[in-house]
From Swiss-Prot:
Protein name, per record: Triosephosphate isomerase
Phylogenetic lineage: Bacteria, Bacillati, Actinomycetota, Actinomycetes, Mycobacteriales
Function: Involved in the gluconeogenesis. Catalyzes stereospecifically the conversion of dihydroxyacetone phosphate (DHAP) to D-glyceraldehyde-3-phosphate (G3P).
Keyword Isomerase: yes
Pfam (any one): TIM
Entry's family note: Belongs to the triosephosphate isomerase family.
Class of the enzyme per the UniProt entry, highest EC level: isomerase
Amino acid sequence: MARKPLIAGNWKMNLDHQQAIGTVQKLAFALPKEYFEKVDVAVTVPFTDIRSVQTLVEGDKLEVTFGAQDVSQHESGAYTGEVSASMLAKLNCSWVVVGHSERREYHNESDELVAAKAKAALSNGISPIVCVGEPLEIREAGTHVEYVVEQTRKSLAGLDATELANTVIAYEPVWAIGTGKVASAADAQEVCKAIRGLIVELAGDEVAEGLRILYGGSVKAETVAEIVGQPDVDGGLVGGASLDGEAFAKLAANAASVA
């Protein structure tokens, strides 16, 4: 089964709602329409930007999709500061990032919480982008494959085959996020192949063949084609390189060249 690559920008805590409009406009207009037939292009934006991006995308019928960077595991109630999946669904979010290493580190998010957030998203028709990845000491010890497979298993706990079919996994080695260090294409392939093997175990060959596994961690326009060209890497979760619309369009075009 041919998997259409997904290039998803993770803006993190950058760009206000006015800047968001300009960035998405530049992205959409800088990427020729035929490229959208080869790759899916998305932005995951701060909560305060979502409504502005939705209005632009739907009003101008842009091919870019959008989503959020986190979601509550709860549906509603006395959870100050939280945003529910149903609220995101009302804004027509297609995606939500869960379990990013920055959430795991700064907010002490566990694999169990990540799985609950993924479940909440799926229950509201939103595809979670479930992030996993090893720290430097695990990589240096040579146990990174086992570590990431087990982390992925726990972060997907409770999801059935249908839910897994609507899930995206992003492999982001923690030591490569925002550091300028990039895992080699072979490194990315090694871990993504192992993740796909886990999905075979959990949900069968058909789901595993259709599920998209992204690489994240200092992805740049110059490196994306080689990484996405690997047999088990189906796109990228892009941080800093997604903050400039035209530069992100170039990155997506380079990914499309190997699709």
